[in-house]
């Protein structure tokens, strides 16, 4: 039977896979996120029976219309990327949603939480448990699935482990590597989530979600290393706390630092799971850890075969399995009174004889460095000096996405350990416009991360200068510039 389903937090990892599954099963889906552009870049904009809705639960907006015709809700919101105060942010979002949920005609809420340990003091785990309690206070039927590590491409916990294995031949780790948990394959989790719709009930329930094996993090990383032909040594150190380990995370993994830090702080506890109750309720064949990892590695190129990269064949052919799934980024945003049209007119002049608006000497130096290792960055080229089209080559760059007066994305063409792109984004905010210049980088192993951090000071210096110079060329005013790095 077709249902109207609201997916709250569709821009997250599980939501990005759950929404297509629900559509394939014939349901009408409302997918919400704080960044609709991210949802659109997945190619969701024109899908039948899918409605994309901007939703920021922290702004205390009225949710009556959102919940009006909804039968089932999937609540997938978490605040790990919010920063040090994410627990307060997460619980406040849950309270706000629960307030309107209580007054709605929603039949059932399926909430994806986290496995719990009796002695756990992790803020991440506490927040997940308390969110479930808040949702139950609405009086609605709440089905809470408590999951541990999800094995799939883009799963933050899985990607942290994969980056550790790919980047470090020897790992000096906190003693949490001996903690045990029950990792589950993404495919198994999605089956549980979607089959729950077929089990109508008026009784709230809590289920542990567990794969077929109880493994330590050390065992998982060693087995992952074997599957990618990477021999590693894991050496636990009692004096190395998770808090201390969290400080160097940004230099080892491309997973966003706030998320990785929150996860690491929860890894020090055993998270035993008894999945027998859920298996009896919704039987399925559970995939082994090794098979789940192999499946995740086969799906790894899904990040590149997307609208974010313009479905570009050159980007797809250059992607390698050991590239970081999550990109590093660095950019500079500037407010201005210049029009979108004037800014776009200048952005289209990038490259060729015109150069790059600012610090052209540094651009030339980088091009010479590329030439010295066999690259072709010294070959200056533009099809047209004034206008750009999709697929155009600009020196060593390639136009992979273009939206007039708003957006330009260039595929990085020089030799370096990773894959990247350079984006120009113009947004109209009514009283002012913003111009943002940003580099995105998927590092190849530890060398790729070293390259990124070595180049970051130059990136920030150049992007700041480029944005100001673009505004100056428009004979306009600029104010409130802002640096952003992840």
Locations of regions flagged by a protein language model:
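Glycine-/Pro-rich loop/turn segments that contact NAD(P) or position catalytic residues
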Residues: 79-167
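N-terminal Rossmann NAD(P)H-binding glycine-rich loop of SDR-like oxidoreductase domains
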Residues: 5-25
């Amino acid at each position: 039977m077709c249902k109207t389903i609201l997916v709250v937090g569709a821009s997250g990892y599980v939501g990005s896979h759950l929404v297509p599954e629900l559509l394939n099963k014939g349901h009408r889906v409302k997918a919400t996120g704080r960044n609709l552009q991210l949802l659109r870049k997945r190619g969701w904009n024109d899908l039948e029976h899918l409605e994309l809705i901007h939703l920021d639960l922290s702004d205390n907006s009225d949710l009556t219309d959102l919940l009006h015709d909804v039968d089932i809700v999937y609540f997938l919101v978490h605040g790990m990327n919010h920063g040090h105060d994410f627990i307060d942010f997460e619980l406040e979002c849950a309270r706000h949603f629960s307030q309107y949920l209580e007054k709605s005609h929603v039949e059932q809420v399926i909430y994806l939480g986290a496995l719990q340990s009796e002695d756990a003091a992790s803020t991440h785990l506490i927040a997940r448990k308390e969110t479930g309690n808040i949702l139950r206070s609405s009086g609605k039927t709440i089905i809470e699935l408590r999951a541990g590590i999800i094995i799939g491409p883009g799963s933050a916990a899985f990607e942290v482990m994969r980056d550790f294995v790919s980047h470090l031949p020897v790992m000096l780790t906190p003693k949490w590597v001996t903690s045990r948990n029950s990792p589950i394959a993404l495919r198994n989790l999605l089956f549980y989530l979607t089959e729950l719709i077929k089990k109508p009930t008026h009784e709230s329930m809590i289920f542990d979600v567990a794969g077929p094996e109880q493994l330590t993090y050390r065992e998982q990383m060693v087995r992952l290393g074997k599957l990618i032909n990477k021999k590693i040594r894991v050496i636990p150190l009692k004096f190395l706390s998770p808090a201390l380990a969290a400080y160097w995370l940004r230099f080892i993994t491309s997973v966003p630092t706030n998320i990785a830090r929150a996860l690491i702080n929860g890894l020090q506890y055993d998270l035993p799971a008894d999945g027998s109750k859920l298996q009896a309720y919704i039987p399925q064949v559970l995939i082994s850890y090794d098979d789940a990892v192999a499946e995740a590695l086969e799906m790894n190129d899904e990040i590149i075969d997307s609208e974010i990269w313009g479905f570009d064949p050159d980007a797809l052919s250059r992607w390698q399995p050991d590239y970081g799934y999550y990109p590093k980024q660095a950019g500079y945003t500037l407010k201005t009174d210049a029009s979108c049209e004037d800014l776009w007119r200048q952005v289209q002049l990038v490259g060729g004889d015109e150069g790059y608006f600012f610090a052209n000497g540094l651009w030339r130096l980088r091009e010479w460095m590329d030439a010295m290792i066999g690259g072709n960055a010294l070959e200056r080229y533009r099809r047209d000096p004034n206008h750009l089209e999709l697929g155009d080559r600009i020196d060593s760059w390639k136009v992979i996405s273009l939206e007039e007066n708003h957006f330009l994305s260039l595929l990085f063409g020089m030799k370096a350990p990773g894959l990247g792109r350079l984006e120009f984004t113009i947004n109209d905010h009514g009283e002012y416009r913003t111009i943002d210049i940003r580099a995105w980088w998927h590092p190849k192993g530890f060398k790729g991360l070293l390259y990124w951090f070595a180049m970051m000071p130059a990136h920030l210096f150049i992007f700041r200068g480029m944005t100001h110079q673009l505004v100056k060329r428009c004979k306009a005013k600029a104010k409130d510039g802002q640096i952003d790095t992840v």
